[in-house]
Amino acid sequence: MASHDSYTGRLPGAFMNPGTSSFTEFLASYNPDLLPGRHMTALAGGMPGNVEAPHATTIVAVTFPGGVVMAGDRRATAGNMIAQRDVEKVFRADEFSAVAIAGTAGIGMEIVRLFQVEIEHYEKMEGRTLSLEGKANRLATMIRANLGMAMQGLVAVPLFAGYDTEREVGRIFSYDPAGGRYEEHEHHSIGSGSVFARGALKKLWRPDLSAQDAALVCVQALYDAADDDSATGGPDLIRKIYPVVATVTADGFRRLPEEEVGELARIVVDGRHDSPGGPTAPLR
């Protein structure tokens, strides 16, 4: 039988009670089944039978004097198959931050959407913006809540980056499946191709990068990852599928247009014709 509130059009009482500024905590107490991963059947062996959940793969982030650049390849895999060629893994978290996912794509994207609402809900409840470190801590709590699904093989791990308006620098935060939060310096990468991307980042990063050069470094690193990791997709000039690249500076979040990223991709691909291994670092 429907409640009296449904007849009058009023919000349920839970929405009218003063409480936490965390939307995730509110949802957990009011309707926990709506939290990421809760609707999936809890199975000791993970996914049933031979079902393969699509996985997002490689993400990179690079700091530069004016902020931070984050980029992700476009491939999602299911086992040894390419599940999608143009999936997006880098998202705007709020005006001064970006979040990207690697791992189980479905759960990761649910976490991103909930995180976006979490930040907006805090600002509406408290009347002020959450600090960059506060956002990073909120995301860690959300990842920790998914630990049960992670232990069954449905792991989703984000990379969070943004412009710290107090320190006036770009910052990068990584996470483990248990919700541990770690600040990374200069650059970082997560996902199946991260070991190859990190090698490229170490060789190409320098402290005086411009925003455009930092974006180019990200595309170079993703190309190296795709070169050695079959789950990472490189720039597809035929289909015009390029990495998603975003910058976060004092002016806010900006996703680079397809044309701009396409030009960076062509620079990388053209350079590989002469030097297949990519740019080399000086020995001295």
Swiss-Prot record:
**Catalytic machinery residues:** T57 (nucleophile)
Keywords (alphabetical) are: Autocatalytic cleavage, Cytoplasm, Hydrolase, Protease, Proteasome, Threonine protease, Zymogen
Describe which pathway this protein belongs to, using the record's wording: Protein degradation; proteasomal Pup-dependent pathway
Q: Which SUPFAM superfamilies match?
A: N-terminal nucleophile aminohydrolases (Ntn hydrolases)
Activity control, as annotated, is: The formation of the proteasomal ATPase ARC-20S proteasome complex, likely via the docking of the C-termini of ARC into the intersubunit pockets in the alpha-rings, may trigger opening of the gate for substrate entry. Interconversion between the open-gate and close-gate conformations leads to a dynamic regulation of the 20S proteasome proteolysis activity.
Entry EC no(s): 3.4.25.1
Any one GO BP annotation for this protein: modification-dependent protein catabolic process
**UniProt keyword Cell inner membrane present:** no
A single Gene Ontology CC annotation of this entry is: proteasome core complex, beta-subunit complex
The listed locations are: Cytoplasm
Which family does the UniProt entry place this protein in?
A: Belongs to the peptidase T1B family.
**What is the protein's quaternary organization?**
The 20S proteasome core is composed of 14 alpha and 14 beta subunits that assemble into four stacked heptameric rings, resulting in a barrel-shaped structure. The two inner rings, each composed of seven catalytic beta subunits, are sandwiched by two outer rings, each composed of seven alpha subunits. The catalytic chamber with the active sites is on the inside of the barrel. Has a gated structure, the ends of the cylinder being occluded by the N-termini of the alpha-subunits. Is capped by the proteasome-associated ATPase, ARC.
Q: What is this protein called?
A: Proteasome subunit beta 1
